[in-house]
Amino acid sequence: MIRPLIIALDVENRQNMQELLKTLPKPLFVKVGMELFYSEGPAVIEQLKDEGHQVFLDLKLHDIPNTVKRAMRQLATLGVDIVNVHVAGGVNMMAAAREGLEAGTVDGRNRPKLIGVTQLTSTNEAMLQKELLIQSNMNGAVSHYARLAKEAGLDGVVSSAQEVPIIHEHCGPSFLTVTPGIRLKEDDKGDQTRIVTPEEARTLGSWAIVVGRSITAAPDPAAAYEIIRKQWEG
């Protein structure tokens, strides 16, 4: 099974994106987040798809069910490969998101995979309990959210690799787990708290990893990509 290594294009604009992509092998699986999408709009997705890349559009929708359904119907027309929502929006919202994707997917294309964000990798247990008022440990909160996502018909969830084993225990091994917060051992942790190396994510069973600064901020992005790819593929 090919498990994706997804590069986070966390850049300000299309020019910065093109400069980064010039340094990397092609085609890639890339993540377009809020900053780049809000700066450049759907045209940047069209360009990436025309160049042969797979795209994870990371907008983390979280609104009332009808609004999310209508938004997902529009996002499906872009031909992206993965989109996401916040699981905290609830089962009805997540189910509506899937309905919107199915309605908007062009005939002959596969529906984008729909995954749910459980807890951000910048969240620690103190924040979970004191700020979000979730009186559970991280494993309990994430596994509960994963079960809700599966109930709503999602394809998988976003979580730290540390929670992947318990997600698979509750939702089965075929339930997709996409893991951000990936760092090489020598890298700065930045604003992430629940981080792992590519090798650790592979061992814990992540389906895909999302890597940003360890590649994009490296002196030699292509060399960093190759190191991470080898660790991930084993």
Curated annotation (Swiss-Prot):
<comment type="function">
    <text>Catalyzes the decarboxylation of orotidine 5'-monophosphate (OMP) to uridine 5'-monophosphate (UMP).</text>
</comment>
<dbReference type="GO" id="GO:0006207">
    <property type="term" value="P:'de novo' pyrimidine nucleobase biosynthetic process"/>
</dbReference>
<comment type="similarity">
    <text>Belongs to the OMP decarboxylase family. Type 1 subfamily.</text>
</comment>
<dbReference type="GO" id="GO:0005829">
    <property type="term" value="C:cytosol"/>
</dbReference>
<dbReference type="Pfam" id="PF00215">
    <property type="entry name" value="OMPdecase"/>
</dbReference>
<feature type="binding site">
    <location>
        <position position="121"/>
    </location>
    <ligand>
        <name>substrate</name>
    </ligand>
</feature>
<dbReference type="InterPro" id="IPR001754">
    <property type="entry name" value="OMPdeCOase_dom"/>
</dbReference>
<feature type="binding site">
    <location>
        <begin position="58"/>
        <end position="67"/>
    </location>
    <ligand>
        <name>substrate</name>
    </ligand>
</feature>
<feature type="active site" description="Proton donor">
    <location>
        <position position="60"/>
    </location>
</feature>
<dbReference type="GO" id="GO:0004590">
    <property type="term" value="F:orotidine-5'-phosphate decarboxylase activity"/>
</dbReference>
<feature type="binding site">
    <location>
        <position position="212"/>
    </location>
    <ligand>
        <name>substrate</name>
    </ligand>
</feature>
<dbReference type="InterPro" id="IPR014732">
    <property type="entry name" value="OMPdecase"/>
</dbReference>
<protein>
    <recommendedName>
        <fullName>Orotidine 5'-phosphate decarboxylase</fullName>
        <ecNumber>4.1.1.23</ecNumber>
    </recommendedName>
</protein>
<comment type="pathway">
    <text>Pyrimidine metabolism; UMP biosynthesis via de novo pathway; UMP from orotate: step 2/2.</text>
</comment>
<keyword id="KW-0210">Decarboxylase</keyword>
<dbReference type="InterPro" id="IPR047596">
    <property type="entry name" value="OMPdecase_bac"/>
</dbReference>
<dbReference type="GO" id="GO:0044205">
    <property type="term" value="P:'de novo' UMP biosynthetic process"/>
</dbReference>
<keyword id="KW-0665">Pyrimidine biosynthesis</keyword>
<feature type="binding site">
    <location>
        <position position="10"/>
    </location>
    <ligand>
        <name>substrate</name>
    </ligand>
</feature>
<feature type="binding site">
    <location>
        <position position="31"/>
    </location>
    <ligand>
        <name>substrate</name>
    </ligand>
</feature>
<dbReference type="InterPro" id="IPR013785">
    <property type="entry name" value="Aldolase_TIM"/>
</dbReference>
<feature type="binding site">
    <location>
        <position position="192"/>
    </location>
    <ligand>
        <name>substrate</name>
    </ligand>
</feature>
<dbReference type="InterPro" id="IPR011060">
    <property type="entry name" value="RibuloseP-bd_barrel"/>
</dbReference>
<feature type="binding site">
    <location>
        <position position="213"/>
    </location>
    <ligand>
        <name>substrate</name>
    </ligand>
</feature>
<feature type="binding site">
    <location>
        <position position="183"/>
    </location>
    <ligand>
        <name>substrate</name>
    </ligand>
</feature>
<dbReference type="InterPro" id="IPR018089">
    <property type="entry name" value="OMPdecase_AS"/>
</dbReference>
<comment type="subunit">
    <text>Homodimer.</text>
</comment>
<keyword id="KW-0456">Lyase</keyword>
